[in-house]
Amino acid sequence: MSKPLILVCNDDGIFSVGIRTLIEVMSELGEVVVVAPDSPQSGMGHAITIGNTLRLEASDLFPGIVAYECSGTPADCVKLAKHHVLKGRKPDLVVSGINHGSNSSISVLYSGTMSAAIEAALEGLPAIGFSLCDYNAHADFSHVKAFVKQIASEVLTNGIAKGITLNVNFPAVINAPLKGIKICRQAHARWEEKFDERFDPYGRRYFWMAGSFENKDAGEDTDEWALANGYVSVVPCSYDLTAHQLLGQLNRDWKFIHE
């Protein structure tokens, strides 16, 4: 029986510690192919490259692993992998990460990590985005390996509904072992931005975005609650942004003319 084919992507770039950890774990589960950005692409969301060149170069960073570095975005990496690198072979699983930093709650909309996974879901492929709530470039991923393997194995064995991707976040290293896995909803939280006005050495004005993450959702069924209480959070996500619950109300209440 042939090994599962697993495509690995990320947004922190091919040189990150997180992707190296993910490749290590996925190599225990199947045949791994890597297509990742050649430089950090954090916060790129679902951007794709249009009207500009895309470059793809083979990489020897991971001995025994077929790997490529791409000049484009995380979503570009998935598209190039499917249509060029894999040459018609269909991955059994696409995994993205492990991101250096949280992609819980509203961050999923800005996340290049999750956009790579969502792009795979758009292609009808099972996909998972993994993130660690630690922004340090040298973050310790050792405590999440077993959970990454467990979750990926579940998807490989049992599958996942088409159009759905899993957003998995891990607490940073803590003094006690992680308590387990919580399947939960996305918290209603947001980033409260502020912009620092600064001047470069030539006296030209520029702005630097700063701010803080604000979670005012007190629910104990959210990803933010799970992470704050020592659990791995798993949120099933859909790329269908339709507010289905409002379709009937708007058709009833809004006085549009219907043919």
From Swiss-Prot:
Cofactor(s) named in the record: a divalent metal cation
Keyword annotations of the record: Cytoplasm, Hydrolase, Metal-binding, Nucleotide-binding
Entry keyword Mitochondrion: no
Disulfide bonds: none
Chief location category: cytoplasm
Binding site for a divalent metal cation: D11, D12, S42, N99
Pfam families: SurE
Catalytic activity, reaction form: a ribonucleoside 5'-phosphate + H2O = a ribonucleoside + phosphate
Superkingdom of the source species: Bacteria
Record-given protein name: 5'-nucleotidase SurE
Native source species: Cytophaga hutchinsonii (strain ATCC 33406 / DSM 1761 / CIP 103989 / NBRC 15051 / NCIMB 9469 / D465)
